[in-house]
Amino acid sequence: MRLHVVDHPLVAHKLTTLRDQRTDSATFRRLADELVTLLAYEATRDVRTEQVDIHTPVSRTTGVKLSHPRPLVVPILRAGLGMLDGMVRLLPTAEVGFLGMVRNEETLQASTYATRMPDDLSGRQVYVLDPMLATGGTLVASIRELIKRGADDVTAVVLLAAPEGVELMERELAGTPVTVVTASVDERLNEQGYIVPGLGDAGDRMYGAAE
């Protein structure tokens, strides 16, 4: 597994505003969308392309286009939905799948409650969207499901990560073609499994379900 922390002043600026408890849901959604696009730029650095011949208004030349099969973008429900627009803004021709995961707040274990994606992901580059890499259980379970379906190149785009989650992924997904792209690796998890300093519950803050 490879970890890439994006170091950019705009990323740091938007992340700081997301962390602020005074930021309302509408602003939170907008900033999360903008931040995802910045992270997506780095996450797609190795997106597969193929050579193509074209004619400009002046002459013939050679360029590149995205290869087939098209990349697959998979937001993890529900908070991952708030990251979808920011990702497909850079990959408008990508296919979109959905993966519903829920975490037991007592055991912190993740389980699947819904899937909608191709059964065969052989040869596909897959981009998984989840705001928080906290304990790591949700992302590990999600990526295992994708690899089971044949995905051979998985990139997880997360706004924030905790060291504990990164360590779990490195241990559980050792030797797999997985990259994690994030704006920050924070200090730690608290006893409730939240990232510290973090930004709270990303889903609740996006959709206004809780303070």
From Swiss-Prot:
Protein EC: 2.4.2.9
Any single GO BP term: UMP salvage
Coiled-coil blocks: none
Xref: InterPro entries: PRibTrfase_dom (IPR000836), PRTase-like (IPR029057), Upp_B (IPR034332), UPRTase/APRTase (IPR050054), Ura_phspho_trans (IPR005765)
Cofactor note: Binds 1 Mg(2+) ion per subunit. The magnesium is bound as Mg-PRPP.
SUPFAM superfamilies: PRTase-like (SSF53271)
Record-listed uracil binding positions: I195, G200, D201, A202
Pathway(s) annotated for this protein in UniProt: Pyrimidine metabolism; UMP biosynthesis via salvage pathway; UMP from uracil: step 1/1
Cofactor(s) of this protein: Mg(2+)
Regulation of its activity: Allosterically activated by GTP.
Binding site for 5-phospho-alpha-D-ribose 1-diphosphate: R78, R103, D130, P131, M132, L133, A134, T135, G136, G137, T138, D201
Keywords: Allosteric enzyme, Glycosyltransferase, GTP-binding, Magnesium, Nucleotide-binding, Transferase
Catalytic activity: UMP + diphosphate = 5-phospho-alpha-D-ribose 1-diphosphate + uracil
GO molecular function: adenine phosphoribosyltransferase activity; GTP binding; magnesium ion binding; uracil phosphoribosyltransferase activity
Protein role: Catalyzes the conversion of uracil and 5-phospho-alpha-D-ribose 1-diphosphate (PRPP) to UMP and diphosphate.
Family: Belongs to the UPRTase family.
Protein name: Uracil phosphoribosyltransferase
Species assigned in the record: Streptomyces coelicolor (strain ATCC BAA-471 / A3(2) / M145)
